[in-house]
Amino acid sequence: MIMMKGFLGFLAAVLLLAVAVPGYADECTNRGLLDTMYCDNDQDLVADNAPAGNCKDPSTLVFTYTPVEDPAVYQDLFSDFQAHMKKVTGKDVIYYTVHSNSAQVEAMRSGRLHIAGFSTGPTGFAVNLAGYVPIAVKGDEKEFQGYNLIMLVKQDSPYQTMADLKGKKVAHTSPSSNSGNLAPRALFPSQGLVPDEDYTVVYSGKHDQSVLGVVHGDYDAAPVASDVYDRMVRAGRVDANAVRIIYTSPRFPTSSFGYSSQLCPDLAEKIKEAFFSYRYTEEMVKAFDGADRFFPITYKDDWAVIREIADATGASYNEEGLKAMIAKEKEDAEKKAKQQ
């Protein structure tokens, strides 16, 4: 029911996307893939800050995190961060619960949401259609939190390069999996290996089953998420000496954090200061797998691999792609309702 409310509430966004909002974007010299509401004159792929006279300086800032099964958990988890944000900006900060990715995009586009954490994929929709400016990812002192796509082969196998897998049997996880299927189909052709053409694809069902299948000799190789593989090694489920990694992709980021480009520049600077001066509570460190801070990123550089995968799989971050996401959310909500 909650998911359906989120879906129905977002239908208004479809109409909103067709409405041109007059303003500074009319003077735009470069827009790129951004909606006509926004401008990208500096060509960093995100919306430029709204100029004085057109920017927003709300008395209360609205924050939310990517939709999850139990929103109350994250509302409590981010309460200390919200208090820090209030101290730095001098403004009240409230948590706004959203029940779908599409509703979250619409909330920022409509001006009801000012600061947010968006999931990896929906970040692209938020940037292009809602004027979202991602600036951080959960991380530590050295790097942002993320994972890589890796190709595993058995240690005693003859396969040393990706080209060696031509004509072999390779386990993908499932058709809808990003790192287990979509990413390999997008990234492997540049390595001279086209799934289904250069090797036979079989679906294992899960990342751990792909890993174990390689170890047991059921598959010649398997593309899997590095974080899943690392957890299996730490848990003793697989011996790292039993396999070899012959390919590692660029790092995939986790959820992004950022703000609306429609906020006044001075306020945006204070929001950035609040993000980067904050250190996670013990509860946050535990919940976010050891991350202890917001690590700075840029959408242009750090989301490049995500955009490449989206383009290669036809999931472009535009209105058509958004409609597809809405349809998928509706389908998932209906399936969930039938199970209850």
Model-derived features: where do they sit?
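Ligand-binding "clamshell"
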Residues: 126-138, 232-246
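Periplasmic-binding protein-like
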Residues: 66-67, 141-150, 237-275, 282-305
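Bacterial N-terminal signal peptides
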Residues: 9-19
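Short helices/loops that flank or line small-molecule/ion binding pockets
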Residues: 102-116, 129, 163, 207-227
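N-terminal hydrophobic or amphipathic helices and topogenic motifs
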Residues: 22-103, 287-340
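Bilobed "Venus flytrap"/periplasmic-binding protein-like clamshell domains
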Residues: 63-86, 121, 141-212, 219-220, ...
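A local structural motif
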Residues: 86-97, 189-204, 239-242, 324-329
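Bacterial N-terminal signal peptides that target proteins for export
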Residues: 1-11
